[in-house]
């Protein structure tokens, strides 16, 4: 297993990593606090929360397994070389566990607070069922040969796919309502900061090791930040340019705005 060549770079790696952890972790709280203060989740898309829970759960499985399992680490070194470093840091593990818990809390708020006519769409439910069904099939494929690195790579790919999909319902809802009221911009600003810090952390490791294998050795982490940053910019454009709050004429507590999920209401499912 490789070790750090530069102590300053190692320290910088840890600092930047925990900045990413703090930014991403704190990003969950503005939405939770907003929901709590309003006693309402009107404006928050339920499909987003449902898909986000699957995304973070799959990311947690990947991080925890690769970080703690000597067997999977050996398979990683056999694949990418024993001079490479494991592309998962302690802050990645801490963040993914925290993310699952906070997303579950947000889901709980949906059940207890005023939510208007919105429901989770059948399409979102279908995506979640298919994804976990696919993961179960992959588990039984990996079991006979103990191909655990391949299996957790599947979970890593799942979280990338879910990252691509999960933002679409919220972006569509903002466009339909011509408003971002009820959707916390604080979440987006912190998520954007975390994405940039995450990339910087990977660059620091690559410079120290004189190798860029950690980018494609953990393609999920690489694509995660890229996709998140893209949608963060889109949401900031919606919030500050297209639909600034001063243009909103209806109070979100009334629940009168359109709250469409990923598909038309005619296809909604309880």
Swiss-Prot record:
Domain of life: Eukaryota
Name of the molecule in the record: Cystinosin homolog
Transmembrane stretches, start-end: 14-34, 93-113, 123-143, 148-168, 180-200, 223-243
Membrane topology: Multi-pass membrane protein
One GO biological process term: L-cystine transport
Keyword Hydrolase: no
Keywords: Glycoprotein, Lysosome, Membrane, Repeat, Transmembrane, Transmembrane helix, Transport
GO MF term (any one): L-amino acid transmembrane transporter activity
Family, per entry: Belongs to the cystinosin (TC 2.A.43.1) family.
Species this chain originates from: Arabidopsis thaliana
Glycosylated residue positions: 52, 174
């Amino acid at each position: 297993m490789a070790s750090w060549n530069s102590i300053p770079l190692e320290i910088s790696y840890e600092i930047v990593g925990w900045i990413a952890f703090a930014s991403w972790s704190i990003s969950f709280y503005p939405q939770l606090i907003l929901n709590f203060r309003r006693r309402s989740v009107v404006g928050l898309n339920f499909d987003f929360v449902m898909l986000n829970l699957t995304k973070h759960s799959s990311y947690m499985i990947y991080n925890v397994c690769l970080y703690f399992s000597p067997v999977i680490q050996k398979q990683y070194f056999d694949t990418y070389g024993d001079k490479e470093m494991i592309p998962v840091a302690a802050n990645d593990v801490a963040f993914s566990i925290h993310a699952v818990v906070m997303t579950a809390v947000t889901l709980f708020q949906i059940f207890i607070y005023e939510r208007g006519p919105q429901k989770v769409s059948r399409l979102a439910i279908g995506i979640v069922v298919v994804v976990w069904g696919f993961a179960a099939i992959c588990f039984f494929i990996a079991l006979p040969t103990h191909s655990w690195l391949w299996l957790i790579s599947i979970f890593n790919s799942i979280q990338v796919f879910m990252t691509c999909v999960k933002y679409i319902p919220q972006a569509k809802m903002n466009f339909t309502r011509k408003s971002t009221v009820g959707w916390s911009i604080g979440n987006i600003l912190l998520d954007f900061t975390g994405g940039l810090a995450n990339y910087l952390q990977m660059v620091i490791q690559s410079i120290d090791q004189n190798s860029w294998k950690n980018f494609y050795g953990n393609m999920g982490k690489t694509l995660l930040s890229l996709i998140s940053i893209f949608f963060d910019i889109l949401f900031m454009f919606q919030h500050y340019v297209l639909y600034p709050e001063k243009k909103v004429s209806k109070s979100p507590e009334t629940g009168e705005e359109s709250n469409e999920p990923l598909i038309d209401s005619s296809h909604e499912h309880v």
